[in-house]
Amino acid sequence: MGRGAILKFIFSLVWLMAVASPAFAADGQANAGANDPRMNQLYAVGGEQTCLKCHNSPPVNLILQTPMAVKGDLHSPFGQQGCESCHGPSADHAAGKMTPDGKLILPPILFKKPLIEGYDVSPVDKRNEVCLSCHQAGLRMNWQGSEMQKAGVACADCHTSHAAKDPVLVKATQPDKCFTCHAQQRAESFEYSHHPIREGKVVCSDCHNPHGSPAADHLLKEFTVNETCYNCHAEKRGPMLWEHQPVRENCLNCHTPHGSNEAHLMKERMNFLCSSCHSDTSTRNGSGGAFGGRGSIPYHSATGNSAFNSALANPRQCLNCHSQIHGSNSPAGAFFFR
């Protein structure tokens, strides 16, 4: 192909693009208009501006201070159909139309119970469906079938979209939101030994994922209790040369997570907790038990139980010798000595 033929081909291609582009653009605009919900008569003319003519005071208009009101973001409600992105088509409501029995027509999706008598909040599944149409990845991927979902909890029961800062997403206010339902955990947070929740150093979502969890219990962020605890208590992870089996099985064998009146979040006084596995018999006569045949040592006399009774009298007596209770790399580690 000669130089002249190549130039002729390029000129023809440019001419076709110049002619076709306006036609394609016009067709695209026509299709966009047909698919634009604002052209649908079910949606309010003027969008969110129509809504804000009446709903112009807190807490409703506080949504204007949130990322949800960024019109330039096509992933935000205001970048799509505004208020109707979440509340559904509301042209009849905006026009003040009434039902046959004389009641004002409200938007199809109501996240909170209206102040007007005779109306109720929308069903949980309808409300959650709206939220999950955008928020379904990441921490929410296990929502379906989760404990919260099965209990009929709605996203709006915890979250507040019409607020500059959602209380459940702010560390200072998140626990109070959780404690409105979890009263037992709230009471435990005031006990002598507790995780620093009230001090603002730990929040519920540091350990739990309320949207669902792959773990069997407790809506944990990790697969097991221990893996969750090790996120902060990494020094207890191991592996150790000498392992303490109850520790490896589950931290909750000895500790309670939210609060305790015993030191170190222990489930009960340390000496009684130890003796629940290391009984008088097993520690004195070497018959096996928790020590696996290594119980007949000088401190736990086989001729009497005075030493054992002394241990029971002092809450921390066991740790005077067996201080490395989470595991040890010491040559004397079989008994978790110092």
Map each language-model feature to its residues.
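N-terminal secretory signal peptides that target proteins for export/translocation
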Residues: 1-7
